[in-house]
C-alpha cells in the first residue's frame, strides 16, 4: 500500500506487465519505497487519472489536474496495443510528456527514452510538485543526472499555462 510521506503528494500508479529485468525495473523500486502502486491488471487502475501516453495529442501542462493520480505503463509496445481497448474504458486523461533527455544509464542522453521513474519525475515537476519529483529521483543513483540534464526545460515547462505553451517551449529544445 502506498503511504505518501506528504498527504499532498500526487498518487502514482504503474501498470506493470512484468516484462522487464526485475533488477533494473524502476517501477518495482518505486513500489518498494512506497512511492507508487503497481497493478498487473488494467481494470484495477484508478479512473479519471492522467495517463502518460507518448502518442497523446495533448501535452502535459500545469493546467492538468493530478489529484486523481498519474499512471505510467511499464510494458512493451505490443502490450500497450493489446491493453489499449481496456484503457479506453477508464476515462483517463491521455497526456504526452514534452522533449526531455534520459538520465538513466541505459538510454543516457537519448531524447524521449525515459524510464518509468523519469516519466513520473518529469510529470510531477511540470505539474508543480518539484519536491515529489526530487524524492522519486533520489532513490536512483543516476536520478540527479536526469534532473540536471533537464533542469532548464523542466523549469520552463513548469511556467507554461497550457498544452500549447508546452509545445511552443519544446520547439526551442528540439
Curated annotation (Swiss-Prot):
Its EC number is 2.5.1.157. GO terms for molecular function: 18S rRNA aminocarboxypropyltransferase activity; S-adenosyl-L-methionine binding. It comes from the Archaea. One of its GO terms (cellular component) is cytoplasm. Keywords: Cytoplasm, Ribosome biogenesis, rRNA processing, S-adenosyl-L-methionine, Transferase. S-adenosyl-L-methionine binds at residues 26, 73, 97, 116. It is found in: Cytoplasm. The keyword Isomerase does not apply. It is an enzyme of class 2 (transferase). It catalyses: an N(1)-methylpseudouridine in rRNA + S-adenosyl-L-methionine = N(1)-methyl-N(3)-[(3S)-3-amino-3-carboxypropyl]pseudouridine in rRNA + S-methyl-5'-thioadenosine + H(+). GO terms for biological process: enzyme-directed rRNA pseudouridine synthesis. Aminocarboxypropyltransferase that catalyzes the aminocarboxypropyl transfer on pseudouridine corresponding to position 914 in M.jannaschii 16S rRNA. It constitutes the last step in biosynthesis of the hypermodified N1-methyl-N3-(3-amino-3-carboxypropyl) pseudouridine (m1acp3-Psi). Belongs to the TDD superfamily. TSR3 family. This is 16S rRNA aminocarboxypropyltransferase. The lineage of its organism: Archaea, Methanobacteriati, Methanobacteriota, Stenosarchaea group, Methanomicrobia.
